[in-house]
Amino acid sequence: MWTARHAVALLVVLTYAYSSILPPGTTFVQSIRDIFRFQEQLKKENVEDTICSETPPESSIPNRDELLELIRKSKIEDHKFDEHVRKKRQLSRISYQEYLDNLGKADYDVRIEEGWTEILYPFGTWAMDKQLMGQAGRETQTNLGFDCPFFGFRFNYTMVYPMGMLSFGLPPFSAPPWTFPNPAWPKQRDHSFVAAFYADAMFQWIGNTKISNVFFRSVHRPRLDDDEVYERNSQTNYGAPNYQQAGAQSAANQQFSNPSQYSQNLNAYSQNQQYNTQLLQQQQQIYGKRKKRQMPGRVSQPGMVVDPWLLDNITRHIQDGYTGANGFRAEHAFIATWYRMAHGGAARALDVSQFEHVKDWQNTFQVVLASDEIRTFAIFNYARLNWTSSNEAGGLDGFGGKQAAMAGFNGGNGTGWYGLPYSGEGRLWKLGYFSNVLTPGRWIHRVDEVIIPAGCTNASNGGMMTAPPWGPMHGGMAINVSGPCLRPADSVKVNFENWQTSCTRLSRVRARCIMPMFHKIGLVPIRMSRDGGQSFPFFGKFYVVNSERAPASVSLKDSVDNKTNRWYEPYAQELALGWQAMNLTWNTGARVDISLFGYWEDADRSHFERIDYLARGISNTGSYSFRPQQLTKQFLLRDAWQKFHFGFVQVALADAEDGVMWSKPTPFPWYHLHEWERYYGRNWPIDMCIEWFEYDGKRNNFQIDLTTDFPCPCKLPQAMLDLGRFMPIMDCDKDGDTSCPFNKGAQHCIQSVQPTFSGSSQQCCYDYDGYLMFTDDWEPDGDYTTFFQPGTPARAHRYGAAPYRLPPFIPTLSNYQLDLNPYRTCCKYADHCEFYYWRRMTNGCQDYRAPAAGYIYGEPHVITYDGIRYTMPGKGYYVLTMSDSPYHKLMVQVRLEQPDDTLWHAHVNATVITGVAVQENDSSIVQVYARKPMRRWRYRTDVYVDGTRRFFDKPHWKHQQFKHLDIRNPLQNMNQSEIVIMLKSGVGIRIFEGFGMLDVMVTLPPSYNTTCRPGESLSSSLNAPRGQRRCYTTLGLLGTYNNDPADDLTTPSGTVTRVQNPTTTASTTQMIYEQFASFWKIDGTNDKIGGVLFQDKFKPIYNPLLFAESDYRPVYWPQTIDMNASRVFTMEQVVSTCQNNPECEYDFIMTGRKEVGLTTLRRQKEFFALQKTGSKQLISCGPLLKKEGVVKTPPAANYLDGDKVVFSCKPKYYIHGDIERVCRNGTWSPGWWAWCRDRNLEYALKWMTALLSIFGISLIFVIFFCILWNIRKKKQAAHAERLQLKEQSDRLNKLENERIFGTSPEKTPLIETDFRSNFNMNQPSRPIPSQPPSSQYSPPVFAAPPPPSQPTRLPTYTNAISQQQRQFEPPRPPRGNMRFETSAI
């Protein structure tokens, strides 16, 4: 049973066992006290570590006497220990005796004993570093193993020097003082270098032991090319450094130093190991484990190792200190460490007892170049700086002298110098106490293109940085800002132009702000305050990108297999979207909301509101899909289906407002489909299209302004030449994106650069024959709808218009609602494009006037606006073209300098263009420079706007807007070798780069073409006093633009030099140079020209010394080849290469470079070809009207003067009208417009016509027969009447004769019968009663006729005749006895 006695016995045994292993002379109680004291000391050190101390802890290395005393005491106490413990103690003493010898090799982690783990990365032979030889100039060059961009150059090697620098070229080895860049370049070397401590230094020796060294190695990541997983500290990692073994070696030395420093966990990668491990484990869970890599052609070896863990640690330090490096990942690094270096001329220590004294005069620092072969960061780590000058510089004991040590970056070849604080001032030791990041003694800079410091500044004012430097105009994006160092109590606010936002402090170097919504695009000023908005002493610039061109953080995934499942389709069954989850938050357990934000604008204001949630509180997995039919709508906005027809998809954290992610603009037909069908019915597309058609027709006619201000060019060459007034549409560019989603069948589409007063934009498209496509040629046919979509004017410009904030001047959004959405509704959903094209008809080119173009190229050769060609070998700053008009105050200047020396080491006595500067009125000043040789691997030009460097290497940077001008770069041109500047007046300037030379083409709109009035001359106008009425025109090396070549060569004073082409002779070239071109040099002597637009900080790129010389004598035109040049090429080679082109031969002979001559030849041919077709004034008759089914031959829009158009019909149609028309003098030949009818309908109509014709003819015949029959009847009736009257007259005469002569008829006369039969056919005949015989004749007595009765109108001819017969029937005698009386006659 366990008792107290057993417990006491066990305690005594444990105490005895513990006392047996204690050092001699140490009691048990003292050891317990030491433990508590150690814990208190450890707590103090942990507290001190959390505070940024200015000085690193002092070293605890004992001196030689103390070392010997420790060894002697240790030997005396050996007999008290067991055999195995005694052996361990003996091995420890032996290793300590080797301490000094190993000190210079650093074959263990010396950072721990010196307290440098917080500032230096692992170095030494244990880390597989190579060592610099003690002899100067030997084994200094090393292979980096990667391409390292630095100051615009690109290097794959470096040279390590003891003087504290990594050089990319041989230094001049001149004595201080030094000046960088070297002003004597190129006569003297000006080497590129990275210097953490540029001063004469030497290795320190103690006796024959070297305790100083320079270590270096390159570090790389594993290559993902095998299945073996890279394991840290594995023996199979191709010789990677073993940090556990190095830590054990350092622990073995703890008895010779302060034991408290070794009680901590060894951290081979610097500070915050626990955080680093968690971060790496999290990354492994997300991205998987890294695989190891074997470097090309070799395994890991001293000086070149694989260590992804170290690269991750370097990446984290860069991301923590540099705002904007979150997307950076160090793939390679080069680490060089200068360990215990003494100043040049320092005394050599002879005994180890002098170690402490020597140590106090040593410098230890480190340079790290980390790169992903695109971006490069330089890290300077200063562990200990104890001297600042060398004896060679005149210093004494490491201080003073003519020039102290320098720290910074030199681009080399006269590129430029960037110095760190205190550089060359004798106070460089302060760099070890201060920092531009969070760790004292560490300085981080980005060095690939321009030198950009990381971190923050303690100055009271200065600049600020944003990351990213741009944002979408709809805002909501998280922007990191840095500039001043931020204290915990600081209240940070940032003004984005006029919008103030409150920011969250993240660390001492950065804060995070939420970008506000903008209604404009372009460069806006930003200001930063850390006192709550009372003052804004830190400033910078921020670029607002339009929503259409901004990179989409949320990707809307359209189905490839099923075209119905796309975001713009109304009947989509399933939709998917994705986003980068880690760009939103590193918290894998975070929840996100997915929302729909809609946009709508009326005539007064715009509305940007949340419509609904697609999902709430879902996991941040980076993807989401849903079925629109099963979507539960919350209807956050009432009647949103009537207005908010498009918008954005937003992904945001569900529980924090820490920035959001946006998609690109997208329509919402799948969301509003149910409401549309319920309101409009099944035919909702056509009803909505007609509704828009009627609404748009009530608005102002914006096309009137476009017809007068920006008529479309007639052909594609004109559109390509008109650089200042038109630019390509980004998604329909023959030199870029050719998808043309809204203009199928077009080869190239353009839009007007500047909007009209009403904010509209002209848009023109050209087919593959180069002709303008017209909406009049469209017809409602399936093929046309799919493959023929001409350009249409836009009511709202894609890039907006001033004042921007009001509709319809808002970039992208106004255009989407007023132009793109109606197109989708009418053309895509309703299949009735005719409604859209009736409201957006293509403008013709009848009013278009082509621009004039001038060109300067080669060395240099000039082609004026009116066609004069000459060569101008001047040097300096010259006026290329200018205008002093009150409406167009234009200035374009060029910088001409001599190129590189020839292969036979002779100066080229000709010049090339290396810089262009442009300004119009009060616009921004644009400067474009060529780059030095070896600096053209990534960018071919440098572009500065108002002194700020601008890049065009990303899709959303391809078009940028500034004050009164735009700059664009072709989409597929990633090296900035072509820059186009578009001024507000319509002037276009295209700059090409080739072999370090710039070619400049200037196009002027017709508004610059001015002709002096009668009685005025150009000379009198130029000399007229200001304020007096004068004739303004363009002047300069490109001549005057007035369609008169005679006065092209006019000086500022009005003197005209008259020449005629060709001018390719030495005498003519000299005359032009001396009498004309030299007067356009900007040297400050002519007030009419003005000053230089170029900034002084941008020096000549070839030879600044030659550029400054005034005794330059050009070669006007080479007649023969120099003797030295004949050893490189022959005249026969020149002639055969240049094809008898004088300009090509000039450049070939002067430079001795065949490629330069061929470039001149090619550029000249391209310009002449473009000018010939682009500057030609074309006469257009406009499109011819045609109906459905009409086929025009040729199929292109041949509507220009002299074009013949032949019309035909498709096989199922039949043509009508005139089938051939000719355009003459802007008018079509007379004729009926062609139209086609369906063949079946044509046949039916023809049969119907034939039948109707037959029926009509028959009817006409019947009618004609009836008419003739009626006429015949009338004639017969008239004839019968005449006969009746005649018979009656004859009968009366006969009766009279009988009375007179006494004869009487024996019977009734036959004439009575005939009369009855002829004149009263429709009534029965009534015989005349016989007269009783009487011997006495008595004339008949006629009674008075009865009153006439109204005859009855009968519709038939028979009744009419009968009525007529009754009318003309003679009176009949009475039936009784008739008594005739003698007639009066």
Swiss-Prot record:
Disruption phenotype: RNAi-mediated knockdown causes a significantly shorter defecation motor program (DMP) cycle period; phenotype suppressed in an egl-8/PLCbeta or inx-16 mutant background. Expanded distribution of inx-16 at the apical junction domain of the intestinal epithelia. Suppresses the long DMP in a gon-2, plc-3, or vav-1 mutant background. Similar brood size, developmental growth rate, and lipid accumulation to age-matched controls. The keyword Glycoprotein applies. It is a single-pass membrane protein. Residues 1179-1238 form the Sushi domain. Keywords: Cell junction, Disulfide bond, Glycoprotein, Membrane, Signal, Sushi, Transmembrane, Transmembrane helix. The keyword Transmembrane helix applies. InterPro entries: AMOP_dom, C8-3_MUC4, Epithelial_Barrier/Signaling, Ig-like_fold, Ig_E-set, IPT_dom, NIDO_dom, Sushi/SCR/CCP_sf. Residues 285-450 form the NIDO domain. Glycans are attached at N156, N313, N386, N413, N458, N480, N562, N583, N909, N921, N975, N1009, N1124, N1225. Pfam families: AMOP, C8-3_MUC4, NIDO, Sushi, VWD. Residues 234-262, 1321-1385 are annotated as: Disordered. Residues 242-261 have a biased composition (Low complexity). May negatively regulate activity of innexin gap junction protein inx-16, thereby mediating the rhythmic frequency of the defecation motor program. Required for the clustering of inx-16 to the cell-cell junction of the intestinal epithelia. Probably dispensable for intestinal integrity. May be a cytokine receptor. This is Defecation cycle abnormal dec-7. It comes from Caenorhabditis elegans.
